[in-house]
């Protein structure tokens, strides 16, 4: 189980976009794409066969997962994530929790 998944609110803790907040759009192994963060301009070549217009486009590039931290909604601060096992009706389930206060993420 990954500590950061799609849909999490995160804050950038290192790099040129330090302090910016956003939502995780995609997780790519040890990198994540965050909405509105690490935006770059790229030149797009037109391709009429695929219906792609040419020009300069802006897109979000992946950030290393070590440069972001999940945002705790209770404290509105960056927090660390832990994983613990919870037994429910004989089944063991892995859940993520905030290390600062122990509250379960997404519950």
Curated annotation (Swiss-Prot):
Going by the UniProt record, its keywords in alphabetical order are: Ribonucleoprotein, Ribosomal protein, RNA-binding, rRNA-binding
Pfam families assigned: KOW (PF00467), ribosomal_L24 (PF17136)
Question: Which Gene Ontology CC terms are recorded?
Answer: ribonucleoprotein complex; ribosome
Superkingdom of the organism of origin: Bacteria
InterPro entries, per the entry: KOW (IPR005824), Rib_uL2_dom2 (IPR014722), Ribosomal_uL24 (IPR003256), Ribosomal_uL24_CS (IPR005825), Ribosomal_uL24_KOW (IPR041988), Translation_prot_SH3-like_sf (IPR008991)
BP terms from Gene Ontology: translation
Gene3D superfamilies documented for this protein: 2.30.30.30
Q: Which GO terms describe its molecular function?
A: rRNA binding; structural constituent of ribosome
Protein task: One of two assembly initiator proteins, it binds directly to the 5'-end of the 23S rRNA, where it nucleates assembly of the 50S subunit. One of the proteins that surrounds the polypeptide exit tunnel on the outside of the subunit.
Q: Which PANTHER family match?
A: MITOCHONDRIAL RIBOSOMAL PROTEIN L24
- Tell me its family: Belongs to the universal ribosomal protein uL24 family.
According to the record's subunit comment, the protein's assembly and interactions are: Part of the 50S ribosomal subunit.
What is this protein identified as? Large ribosomal subunit protein uL24
Q: Which organism is it from?
A: Neisseria meningitidis serogroup C / serotype 2a (strain ATCC 700532 / DSM 15464 / FAM18)
Q: Which gene encodes it?
A: rplX
